[in-house]
From Swiss-Prot:
Keywords (A to Z) from UniProt: Ribonucleoprotein, Ribosomal protein, RNA-binding, rRNA-binding
PANTHER family membership: 60S/50S RIBOSOMAL PROTEIN L6/L9, LARGE RIBOSOMAL SUBUNIT PROTEIN UL6M
Role played: This protein binds to the 23S rRNA, and is important in its secondary structure. It is located near the subunit interface in the base of the L7/L12 stalk, and near the tRNA binding site of the peptidyltransferase center.
Record's protein name: Large ribosomal subunit protein uL6
HAMAP family, sorted: Ribosomal_uL6_B
Encoding gene, per UniProt annotation: rplF
Length: 176
């Protein structure tokens, strides 16, 4: 059995409902509905969730660990939420959040406007910082990757959009 799949999930004040092949996790920040793989059994035991594979096949063992991680992320998302911080490095690089849009000035001849999907918010504490927040970990990471993709950090000066915890290794310039 998967080592990840063995450990129970503490619900931390979230409500869980199991119905027709899907699990609904409800918390103070919102609700996430996730389909449950048929190779995994889910049991709710007084504030904890236990997952077990249906049989001892490799696929069922692997899916029990995967489903445990997905459900644990859903519980964390609806109780505490997820956030990803981005930093803009470069002269004239600016960001501004306006409602469900993120306006970026990244050295192009035109401003870049990124439309935020439903359930994901962007905040700009300063002009060179972006904080992306939401309850769905996958969605928050995807939006952060899309914003970073507009101008990834280049290897010579490090200019571009980077994650706040990202370390950009700079190359040395060509010498005569």
């Amino acid at each position: 059995m998967s080592r990840v799949g063995k450990s129970p999930i503490a619900l931390q004040g979230a409500e869980v409902k199991l119905a027709d092949g899907a699990i609904t996790v409800k918390g103070p920040l919102g609700t996430i509905t996730q389909p449950v793989n048929p190779l995994v059994n889910v049991a709710n035991n007084d504030g904890t969730l236990n997952l077990a594979p249906v049989n001892e096949s490799r696929e069922a063992n692997a899916m029990s660990g995967t489903m445990r991680a997905i459900i644990a992320n859903a519980v964390h998302g609806v109780t505490k939420g997820f956030e990803r911080k981005l930093t803009l490095v470069g002269v004239g690089y600016r960001a501004q959040a306006q409602g469900d849009k993120l306006n970026l000035s990244l050295g192009f001849s035109h401003p870049v406007v990124h439309q935020m999907p439903e359930g994901v918010k962007a905040e700009t504490p300063t002009q060179t910082e972006i904080v992306i927040k939401g309850i769905n970990k996958q969605q928050v990471g995807q939006v952060a990757a899309e914003v970073r993709g507009y101008r990834p950090p280049e290897p010579y000066k490090g200019k571009g959009v980077r994650y706040s915890d990202e370390v950009v290794i700079l190359k040395e310039t060509k010498k005569k």
